[in-house]
Amino acid sequence: MHTRRLVKRSVIGSRVYAPGLTGDAAPLTGVIQAVKQDNRDASTGHRRNVYTVLMQDGSVKEYSEEEIAQMTAKAPLKSSLKSTCNGGQRDGLTQGQNGGVQRGEALSLSPESTEEPRVLEHKRTGRALETEKDHTRSVSLLEQKRKVVSSSIDVPQARKSEEEVDMDKVTAAMVLTSLSTSPLVRSPPVKVSEGLNGSWKDGGFTPSSYSSSGYWSWSAPSDQSNPSTPSPPLSADSFKPFRMPSLSGPPDDNIDEHDGNSLLFDEPIPRKRKNSMKVMFKCLWKNCGKVLSTAAGIQRHIRTVHLGRNCDSECSDGEEDFYYTEIKLNTDSVADGLSSLSPVSPSVLSPPPALDQRQPDGTNGTKSESSSSTPLSRSAPSALYLVHTDHAYQATTPVTIPSTSSTGFTPSSSSFSISWQSPPVTFTGTSASPTHSRTQGFGEQHSQTIAVLSSPPRAAGSLSRKSRGEGKKCRKVYGMENRDMWCTACRWKKACQRFVD
């Protein structure tokens, strides 16, 4: 029993076995009264513990740690007992601590003091058993607590592998890419006035399908009512659905309300292609040539307009599949074709001489009065004519002007047409259809004419710019190896601020 191993629990009062006085093998029980260290082996650094033991017969003797350990190993019973000694025993403990009791000396006690341990021996035995049970119970509880603590430790879950993390990143990137190419994100809100001045007007397409959700598709302005008008070339911007939050024009009668939903949800969103090729669907009906971006839209167009059926696609027999085909459009080539067009200035616009003979007599005074004004005001119509922006199939046949001038303005009593031949855009209007026509005042006519005629100079300004990559940049001037000499904009891959065109 080493004192350093029992720091919190004292051995004083423990019941041990010690050799008898006669030296035979029969051990005697005793209670440890004091502990001290023997300094005889101080030179070797090892110190033995010497225990003062109150023997069973009342005598007090000192035993070394080895003697008590040997006798305890041979003893049939191992137990520990807290000492509840009387005053005489505590006196013996005091004497043992003070070194007053030597080895082999017996402390003489009165007969009453020697009988008291014998009388209380039975009580001590019972208490020893209870103490041993309590000690065993405490040890078992301690072990259980340790097990509970070890089992209740939160073990972290297995971390995901790097492949799974990479797959999550790839999935997120695909979702973001699909969202960025969706019609809602790709097409910003465009006002009607901005649409008249925008670049999409140069493509020769008029709005032909409209739904309650506010999405438009664009097609060529040719229909059954206008069989002689050829289909103009397609443009790169003609297939993007535009969102019209406020639209003053009339809706299309032959397109149901599910057009926008089918455009968004019925078919997968097309991904951007690196080769700038777009798959479109063209109507093969005679003198139609309508082009839509979805198969569902072109089927609905053929079913409702040409076949005269108003039922849904579920009750259709599939006849409309024979009247459309897939076409691939290279948007880069269309953009190059538009960039090769020569700009036109409205200052040189003048009506052709053949139009003077076609004009009625009532407009001669108006024409003579407007001859002294500016060319822009000379091209504006008078208040006698009604301006309408109906769809192509709702309008009458426009007057075609075979002249070399890029702009022709043909006022008449029934209709007039303003057409840009390169690229062709036709605005047709009638005053005979009250259900689809919209009458405007003179102020609206004048502003609309200005909007129509002001787009060619804007196109001229955009076409006069240098194409991408022609201007000087820090990357071209200094090179990739001298990146520290670049301007801040070039470092962040923005437009160069040092070499401005």
Swiss-Prot record:
Locus of motif CR1: 472-476
Positions annotated as zinc finger (C2H2-type): 281-306
GO BP annotations, alphabetical order: regulation of transcription by RNA polymerase II
Motif mapping: CR2: 490-494
Protein name in UniProt: Zinc finger protein 704
UniProt keyword Transmembrane, yes or no: no
Alphabetical keyword list: DNA-binding, Metal-binding, Nucleus, Transcription, Transcription regulation, Zinc, Zinc-finger
GO CC aspect terms: nucleus
Function: Transcription factor.
Low complexity composition-biased segments: 368-380
Chain coiled-coil ranges: none
Residue ranges, compositional bias (Polar residues): 80-96
Compartment annotation: Nucleus
Domain notes: The CR1 and CR2 motifs mediate sequence-specific DNA binding.
InterPro entries assigned to the protein according to its UniProt record, in alphabetical order: CR1/CR2-DNA-binding_regulator (IPR052253), DUF4772 (IPR031940), Znf_C2H2_type (IPR013087)
GO molecular function per UniProt: DNA-binding transcription factor activity; RNA polymerase II cis-regulatory region sequence-specific DNA binding; zinc ion binding
Source superkingdom: Eukaryota
Region Disordered, residue ranges: 80-138, 183-203, 216-267, 340-380, 398-419, 427-446, 453-472
Comp. bias (Basic and acidic residues): 115-137
